[in-house]
Amino acid sequence: MCELIGILIPTTSFKRKWTTFKDTIFYQIYLQSFLKTYCSNYSYVFYLIVDDDDKVFSDSIIQTEIIKYVNQNKNLSLKFISTNGIPKGWVTKMWNRAFLQAYKDGCQYFFQCGDDIMFETKGWVHQSVEALKKHNNVGLTGPIDNGRFVNGNPIFMPGGARFIHTQAFVSRKHMEIFGT
């Protein structure tokens, strides 16, 4: 059986002119690049974290379309997670809610990220899993933000004094050690 990876993604159509799934950044950027770079030797569940009143993502017809689109790809599925009770914009609480659900669902690894990520490197999932396994599944890893290299000051790059790893890939041990 494939190792199961939970991908935790808050998203919103608030203040955006989207009316369909295919209008969204999640479809146009995230999914299109993910599908070109993911490792089909793993199984994935996207945990899409949405507001109950979101004009696009809470629409049941659009939700069905999103699930159908994702499910047509090898080893991919998707669940919607409600932000009910979480103050608007509190992304860490959103990630934590999805992390807990993914943990309960049996995911071995978790990737917290935004809906606007563009993946460029094939094999990034396998590299992330292997990096964690080398350290008994303790630690944090994930893909590099190439924009930092093109546009960034060296202090914001990996190893730099002000580097912040915002897209984190962790194992179940992270939850066992730190909780949500």
What are these regions (language model features)?
Residues 29-33, 65, 93, 97, ...:
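Alpha-helical elements of Rossmann-like donor-binding domains used by nucleotide-donor carbohydrate transfer enzymes
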Residues 23-43:
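Short, acidic, metal-binding catalytic loop of nucleotide-sugar glycosyltransferases
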Residues 107-118:
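Short beta-strand-to-loop acidic/aromatic patch adjacent to the donor-nucleotide binding site
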Residues 15, 49-63, 118:
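A conserved acidic beta->alpha catalytic loop
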Residues 55-107:
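Active-site-proximal specificity loops/subdomain of glycosyltransferases
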Residues 9-29, 52-54:
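Active-site beta-to-alpha loop of glycosyltransferases that engages the nucleotide-sugar donor
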Residues 118-180:
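Conserved catalytic core of nucleotide-sugar-dependent glycosyltransferases
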Residues 4-5, 37-47, 76-78:
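Short loop->beta transition adjacent to catalytic acidic/histidine clusters or analogous donor-positioning motifs
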